[in-house]
């Protein structure tokens, strides 16, 4: 399995630790940078990770910045990417099993290195569990990636709200 990993300058050492961990586990790593602590911008590396995954060069991706918010937003702009900002195992497993996430994002200043590697391993091992409901939801989310007139209409998500009101979704 190939895993793309990227970060900004704030968490380079965290990324290096993640890359080293993944390699010791036998995964092939595509290190998308950055490689030092010289100031840079997280969107560059979020985009690189997203493109590696979306193109099929990598199977999964990991993005890290200070809080995780910026780089996760950036990677989610790449068509075909479903990334979740996670800080715990439950969220990472849910993202993979229910939403077929292909990237996870971390805040290196928020989540410690040992916890990050545990979460990454849980994410890698989790398997997407397709259901009729989550397939439809994932398809609807994918429609947002491409501009179409319908997404500008106020009723774009009405079908899902109606299902919620009928009790078809459960928390």
Swiss-Prot record:
Top enzyme class: isomerase
- Bilayer-crossing residues are none
Q: What does the record give as its pathway?
A: Carbohydrate metabolism; D-galactose 6-phosphate degradation; D-tagatose 6-phosphate from D-galactose 6-phosphate: step 1/1
The record's subunit annotation is: Heteromultimeric protein consisting of LacA and LacB.
**EC?**
5.3.1.26
Reaction(s) the record says it catalyses: aldehydo-D-galactose 6-phosphate = keto-D-tagatose 6-phosphate
- Which protein family is named in the record? Belongs to the LacAB/RpiB family.
Which GO biological process entries does UniProt record here?
A: D-allose catabolic process; galactose catabolic process; lactose catabolic process via tagatose-6-phosphate; pentose-phosphate shunt, non-oxidative branch
Q: Which gene encodes it?
A: lacB
- Which of UniProt's keywords are assigned here? Isomerase, Lactose metabolism
Q: What name is this protein filed under?
A: Galactose-6-phosphate isomerase subunit LacB
Q: Which GO terms describe its molecular function?
A: galactose-6-phosphate isomerase activity; ribose-5-phosphate isomerase activity
Name the SUPFAM superfamilies on file. Ribose/Galactose isomerase RpiB/AlsB (SSF89623)
Which Gene3D superfamilies does the protein's record reference?
Answer: Sugar-phosphate isomerase, RpiB/LacA/LacB
- Which species is this UniProt entry from? Streptococcus agalactiae serotype V (strain ATCC BAA-611 / 2603 V/R)
Q: Which InterPro entries match?
A: LacB (IPR004784), RpiB_LacA_LacB (IPR003500), RpiB_LacA_LacB_sf (IPR036569)
Top-rank taxon, per record: Bacteria
């Amino acid at each position: 399995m190939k895993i793309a990993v990227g970060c900004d300058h704030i968490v380079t050492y965290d990324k290096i630790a993640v890359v080293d961990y993944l390699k010791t586990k036998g995964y092939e790593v595509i290190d998308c940078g950055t490689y030092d602590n010289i100031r840079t911008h997280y969107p560059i590396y979020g985009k690189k990770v997203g493109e590696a995954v979306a193109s099929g060069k990598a199977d999964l991706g990991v993005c890290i910045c200070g809080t995780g918010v910026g780089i996760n937003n950036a990677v989610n702009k790449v068509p075909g990417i479903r990334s979740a900002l996670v800080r715990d195992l439950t969220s990472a497993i849910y993202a993979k099993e229910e939403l077929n996430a292909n990237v996870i994002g971390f805040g290196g200043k928020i989540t410690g290195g040992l916890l990050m590697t545990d979460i990454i391993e849980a994410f890698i091992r989790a398997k997407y569990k397709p259901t009729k409901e989550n397939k439809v939801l994932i398809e609807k989310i994918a429609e947002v990636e491409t501009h179409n007139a319908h997404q500008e209409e106020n009723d774009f998500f009405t079908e899902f709200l109606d299902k919620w009101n009928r009790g078809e979704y459960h928390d």
